[in-house]
Amino acid sequence: LIEKIVQTEKIDCDFERVSGYLLGTNTKDLQAELESAHQSGLVDVLFEKESPIDPKSAALFFPQQAQFHPQKYLNGLAEAIIKKGGKIYTNTYVKDVQEKETVVVTTQAGVTITCQSAVVATNTPFLNTFAIHTKQAAYRSYVLGLAIPQGSVVRSLYWDTEDPYHYVRVCSGDQAD
């Protein structure tokens, strides 16, 4: 869906298809992940005895994964929504959403917005539509940005299932990746 929106709306967000690799040191765990992937309909996922970044460990190969710049995508998506007559309300705290023939959104300031559709995008649900909200814990993520010689690492996505997990992606720069 994201790829179709990028193409239709001509959003410049560095969208590209790349290979993905789930890295692992435990072959049994990777085999279980492979079975789960296949049961979920991801039949193109393959087991590889050698990962591209560590020939001593195996990996699962996920073809045709998507990679894009999320902020550029969201900026382009917002422009497309506004161009088509949509409205985006930022820094607006919502306390209630009622769905009937139309959607009525009520803000903390008491303002009501009536519309055909509303997107509620939050990190945690604030509406009482779910009987149980699972435990939410605070987590930290650390990001490293490194310059590497262009072409020195195959443009792919790499991740593992360790705790904490590791995730690597290569992004193009002017003189380095």
Model-predicted segments: where are they?
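Fold-independent oxyanion-binding glycine-rich loops
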Residues: N26, E50, Q64-Q65, N91-T92, ...
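A generic structural signal for short, solvent-exposed coil/turn residues
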Residues: F15, D54, A80, G86-I88, ...
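Flavin (FAD/FMN) cofactor-binding and adjacent substrate-gating region
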Residues: L1-G76
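General beta-strand structural signal in soluble alpha/beta enzymes
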Residues: V45-K49, I88-T90, V120, W159
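Hydrophobic helix-cap positions at the C-terminus of alpha-helices
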Residues: I5, A37, A80-I81, C171, ...
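Helical element adjacent to the flavin cofactor pocket in flavoenzyme catalytic cores
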Residues: S36-A37, A59-S117
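Active-site substrate-recognition segment that forms the wall
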Residues: L1, T8-E16, V94-D96, T102, ...
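Glycine-rich loops and low-complexity Gly/Arg-rich segments
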Residues: G41-L46, P70-Q71, G85-K87, Y142-L146, ...
